[in-house]
Amino acid sequence: MYLKIHETKDGNIVAACDKELIGKVIEDKNGVCIDLDKYRNFYTGKIVGEEELAKALRNFSSVNLVGKKVVAVAVKEGLIDENDIRYINTIPYIQIYQI
C-alpha cells in the first residue's frame, strides 16, 4: 500500500492507494474516472503496512483512499461503514472530510 501525507495549514490530507493500482486509469460506464497514472504523485509517498496506514488515519483533515486493501483498513478502524464505500468499476474508493 502506498501512503502519502500532504501537510497543509488546515491539517493533513491522507492519500493511500493499493500498490498494484498505481499507473492505471480506472473508469466506469458513466465516465467516472480516477487516473492513477497522471496523479500517481498524489498517492506515492512510501510503501506501508496496515498498522502504519491505520496510524495515519487517526490524524487527518481529509482522506482519499483507492483500493480494496486501503479501504479495508478504514473499515477495520471504524472510520467508515461498508455502506459508505463507492466503487469505480469494482475498485473501492472513499473520501472523508472532517468539518
Residues of each region from the PLM?
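Conserved mixed alpha/beta catalytic, RNA-binding, or beta-rich assembly cores of soluble enzyme
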Residues: 1-61, 65, 84-85, 94-98
